[in-house]
Amino acid sequence: KDLKWKTGAIKAIKVLNELNYLTVVITNQSGVARGYFTEKDVNNFHNHMNSQLKKRKIIINDFYYCPYHILGKGKYKKKSLDRKPNNGMIKKAIRKWNIDSNKSFFVGDTFADQMSAQKSNIKFYKANKNLYLLIKNILKYESRQKFL
């Protein structure tokens, strides 16, 4: 219910799907560690995203999230190699989907996103106000089998 898509995001994912690009979400979710919401809530949110996309015949291929934070509570209070700026989640996606990092790109909006991509030797692009226009420009310069 709290889902608000960034401008151009749905159209960007649609274009990537149509061109057979792999789309993967990599996200830190410290709200789990802090007790604001649960892992089930995160998974439900991701499922809700894809259910909205499915109505338009669009899909995000996979989701990776890190629920841990050093200031978290209970079992979630810890350092994690998955938490960006580390690249554990990207490594998992690379293994699962047989992704070629040299032919991939990562769109993100934080310095942690940029560092995570760099540690994986993946080209990074800073998200702007319109993700569709950004993806359109990226596609002018990139080859197939991409990572988002």
Where are these regions (language model features)?
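Short, basic/glycine-rich phosphate-binding loops at helix/coil junctions
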Residues: 23-24, 64-75
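Short alpha-helical scaffold segments that flank and stabilize functional sites
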Residues: 12-15, 30, 96, 119-120
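Short, flexible active-site-adjacent loop segments at beta-strand->alpha-helix junctions, enriched
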Residues: 29, 67-69, 110
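Short, acidic loop-to-helix structural element flanking the phosphoryl-transfer center
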Residues: 1-26, 33-47, 81-87
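Asp-based, Mg2+/Mn2+-dependent phosphohydrolase catalytic module
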Residues: 40-61, 73-106, 110-148
